[in-house]
């Protein structure tokens, strides 16, 4: 991960809310659900899964399952394998997502918000503008970000990407 302590964000930051993740934890990522949601949002037929074969001994088989999204990529066939049919299906869905770059497409529901409140989790009470500086200088490990819609209601997201519009060199402050 790049060191970002050289920059401090200005007040023009936006939170670009998305499900995009750079490092995906396979245990926590629901690849089948993500693929179903992708197809539903884009009005494609749901992905189809076909069991191709079962290899190995009966007490420890390996399953191979093919995943296809006919409306999106008619000739695309992505094969996942696993020690159970469930694992093979999940791996086939993940391979489809990865090979088709579905996590980087602009198909997710994205909305821009201005930063309303940033509260760092540190023991001392920060100065009014210290919240953003704290994010970069390592004084805190977590930052609570509250996003509000124009009507004032709080918007919750499972993950988000912080998009920096302007930045300044820390020596200029």
From Swiss-Prot:
A biological-process GO annotation: regulation of regulatory ncRNA processing
This protein's GO CC annotations: RISC complex; RISC-loading complex
One of the record's GO molecular function terms: double-stranded RNA binding
Record-linked InterPro entries: dsRBD_dom (IPR014720), RLC_Component (IPR051247)
Keywords per UniProt: RNA-binding
SUPFAM superfamilies in the record: dsRNA-binding domain-like
Every DRBM domain range: 30-102
Record's protein name: DRBM domain-containing protein 340R
Lineage: Viruses, Varidnaviria, Bamfordvirae, Nucleocytoviricota, Megaviricetes
């Amino acid at each position: 991960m790049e060191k970002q302590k050289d920059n401090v964000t200005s007040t023009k930051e936006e939170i670009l809310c998305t499900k995009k993740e750079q490092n995906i934890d396979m245990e926590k990522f629901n690849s089948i659900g993500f693929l179903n949601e992708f197809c539903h949002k884009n009005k494609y037929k749901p992905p189809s899964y076909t069991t191709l074969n079962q290899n190995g001994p009966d007490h420890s088989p390996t399953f191979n399952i093919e995943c296809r999204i006919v409306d999106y990529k008619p000739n695309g066939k992505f094969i996942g394998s696993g020690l159970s049919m469930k694992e093979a299906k999940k791996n086939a869905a993940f391979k489809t997502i990865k090979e088709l770059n579905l996590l980087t497409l602009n198909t997710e529901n994205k909305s821009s918000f201005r930063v309303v409140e940033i509260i760092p989790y540190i023991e001392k009470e920060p100065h009014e503008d210290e919240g953003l500086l704290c994010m970069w200088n390592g004084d805190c490990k977590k930052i609570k970000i509250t996003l509000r819609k124009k009507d004032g209601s709080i918007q919750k997201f499972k993950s988000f990407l912080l998009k920096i519009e302007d930045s300044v060199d820390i020596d200029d402050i």
